[in-house]
Amino acid sequence: AWNLRPGIALSEAQMAQLTSDIVWLVEQTVTLPDGSTTTALVPQVYLRLRPGDLDAGGALLAGANVDVTLAGGLKNTGTIAGRQLVSIDAGRIAHLGGSISGNQVALRSASDIRIEGASVTAVDALSVQAVGDVTVASTVETLSGGGYHQYSTTQLQRVAGLYVTGATGSGVLSVVAGRDVTLQAAQIHNASSDGVTQLVAGNNLTLGAQTLTHSTDITANDRNFQRSSETTHAVSSVQGAGNVVLAAGNDLTLTAAQVGAGKGLALQAGRDINSVAAVDISSSDRSSVTRSHSLAASSTDETVRGTQLGAGTNIVLQAGHDLTLASTAIASQSGGIALAAGNDIQLLATQEQHDAVVDQQTRRKSALSSKTVTTHDESHDSLAVTSSLSGESVHIAAGNDLRSQGAQIVGTGDVVLAAGNNLTLETAQSTHSESHDKQTVKSGLMGSGGIGFTIGKQTVKTEADTSAVSHTGSTVGSLEGNVTLAAGNTLAITGSDVLALQGDITAKAKDIAITEVHDTSDSTQKTAFKQGGLTVSLSSAALNLAQAAVSSAEAGKKAQGDTRMQALAGASAAYSAYGAGQAMGSASAKDAAQ
């Protein structure tokens, strides 16, 4: 039907109609060993092109099955695709910026595997195994521009990821390293609801982040500019629709990581488990100066982003030595939460800082006077971002000390906290302070509030300061079950709540100390006034005589019909005018003497 004849190459129209990959015999001219040429049928591979197989700038290695075995290294920046299987076994593997895909994908290395800014995708199963290290890292790029408006940006360039896309079946996504497994802003996703996602390191397992920055600088001169900067973090994500396991022979470290499981979630470390927050920072600095106004303003705001661990059923964290969770949220939808450590367990808060400072000055000047208003306003906040655990039940056991710093620990059923040595429930502290200063300076000719004026200088200064300390107490509570607190030595509860809404509370320890904590606040206000110079005003005697002179003059007008009355009124007016003049002269002399 398609007019296919052996020896004739396929046309573009025929290749477009392929429903599968084929090997076709094509007539070509070949060179024989004696140098002569002849025509022969040569096998030609025709691949059915599918979406994602190849882009305009890449190289393609594709087939129904792709099996690569190398004693040395493999460096791939293109596309490797297999309809069924992609198997790569090499001394070392560097997968940089390209893609590897297949129904099943297996990467094995006798040394290290580096996946940077690249993806590996499988439908049913994905295995990455190295004797040395496995690194999956997203790449970043830096852009900048100059001139009047300068900027610099460090942003994600290519996201690195390992993916199993089949939602049905028991899909497996496995990453195993003899030494370290390191994720940097990487994506690990397994869509199989009955599958397993596991990251296993013989040494250290790190779920890290890439730091991203953006800054701008608009500068007219050293007194007029506007600058801003932002630092954020692209974090790693491990998501599995089924069970998820993270295991390290030594340390397991999570930095603001997002880890989720549709079913169970387990984190295990032979030594320490450390979950720390990433702190994003935004800052600005502005200055503006004109003849009548100047402004200098700066601000810094932090955002604490902690690790989030979530699962549909049970969540287990087990450390051979210490378990430390800072600003970490752990939540199970329908299962329990269990934390265990051979030594110490700490549920800590991270401080989030917010600062702002504004200085302004306004100047007004005329021929006879001037006024300058200077203000200074600043505020500082340090906020505690605490940890939280929420599950059907919560069990926490430490071989040595267990410390909760403002953590919220809540279970529907039983909640148990146990420490071989000391169990401490304490508060996380937040602080606030602000200061407002204003100074008004007037000079030259000023009104004195009455009939007169002042020539000199006046300064009015006000200050207002406020400070406050607040506390977020730890909460250990059960909605329907019992709460048990057990310590081999001391149980200390400071400013915290222990609640069992429907059950019992049991506390066991050699010593039990319960202490209240009170929030505090303090504020002060000050006002200062200073004035110096010459004040000119009319005295009371001068005002009275002046008013008498006016009254006498008016009386003279009214007495115009009677000559005797006119003469008396005129004499009275002259006397009053003379007295007013004398009084004003006396007042001026008195002011001059002062």
Model-derived features: positions:
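Binding/recognition "hotspot" determinant
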Residues: 1-594
